[in-house]
Amino acid sequence: MTPFAEGIWVDIGPARILGMRLTTTMTVLRLDDGSLLLHSPLTLTAERRAAVEALGPVAHLYAPSRYHDLRIGEWAAAFPSARLHAPSGLVKERIDLRIDRVIGSVPEPAFLSVIDELLIEGFRLEETVLIYRPTRTLVVADLVHNVGRPQDLVDQVVYPANGIL
């Protein structure tokens, strides 16, 4: 985990989408009670789990959009007492998950003093952005993405074909 700001850590992992080599970011936020919220969790590895557990107890798993749920089941199995928050579209798509709260339905009491949630309506992915009030940090998933420069011939073809660069 890389410290980002007071109470915020990030970890970056590889992702391949539509043939493009991208990165994806997991953000860890500390709540008032010292527990953690994992936003868009990456693949669960022993090293990553140990790094997260060193920061505090995992209390919340957060799928910020319909595309950021791929690894959340691994974390839910590892931390069965953690509450799982997900967009409404995942309720039908991921019947294998125990979704404790549909984002936007009711406020999460544990977030009220430190996190504001804003559901971006009209966006097919049903993305929710978070504002971490203690540091005034905006946490996003797909609304903002730094793809970087194409690394090889495949990227040079695939990026423009997908409207990037």
Identify what each model region corresponds to.
Residues M1-D32:
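Zn-dependent metallo-beta-lactamase
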Residues T2, E6, R16, L37-L38, A86-E127, R133, ...:
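Metallo-beta-lactamase
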Residues A5-D11, L37, L112-E117:
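Short, hydrophobic/aromatic-rich segments at coil-to-beta transitions
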Residues V10-P14, L31-L44, R101-S105:
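Glycine-rich phosphate-binding "P-loop"
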Residues L18, T45-A46, Y67-R71, V91-R94, ...:
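Active-site environment of divalent metal-dependent phosphoester hydrolases
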Residues L29, S65, L84, L130, ...:
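Divalent metal-coordination and catalytic microenvironments
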Residues T43-P87:
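Active-site metal-binding motif and surrounding structural segment of the metallo-beta-lactamase
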